[in-house]
């Protein structure tokens, strides 16, 4: 029976942050933010993809497939778009095989290639309505669950606030297979994805890495934005349920309570 416990907290980030794998254009800014996509002279550029993953793999289900881990994560991000009417393309928190590499940019968010089914589970924060047949985004901008596909399995409308810090809570109960995700602005405006029942064993290998991926527009240089992660907490184990893990993490950062 697996008993692994993973727990980490980044109150802020430092350049060449230990325990973080940087992929693509991801860097840490001088202000301690994890910036996933590229900037030039402080402004975002198009055709950028960046990802950042924690170096320690997570044992998401045991080798006998009899038990699935619980996890809880909290983080905040800020997106800056020079033109709020030309945002693209968004960012995501994701779980993927330990050796996973960046994929296609634009609406694929660095997580998938065109026409691909892949062992990736993600919660996306989508800032561009892409009607590509693969993606088929709903109107309006949204939070979505990606389960082995860039086409969201479920979505909830999201009113994006430019330059505002969004705090996100994502939990997964390995017993009930329930995944929940909520985004909050200023402790007052909430956007919650309807609870999704998904068995991670159907999509992922038993060991995964967790992290973030983001992309800017692929074809028009005006559809750009920055994607900054401000802090990140994560905990997973087989014994404690997501509510208990959440209490553990709010003990680390009382501002999340």
Give the positions of each predicted feature.
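Polar, low-complexity loop segments and adjacent catalytic/binding residues used for recognizing
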Residues: 1-257
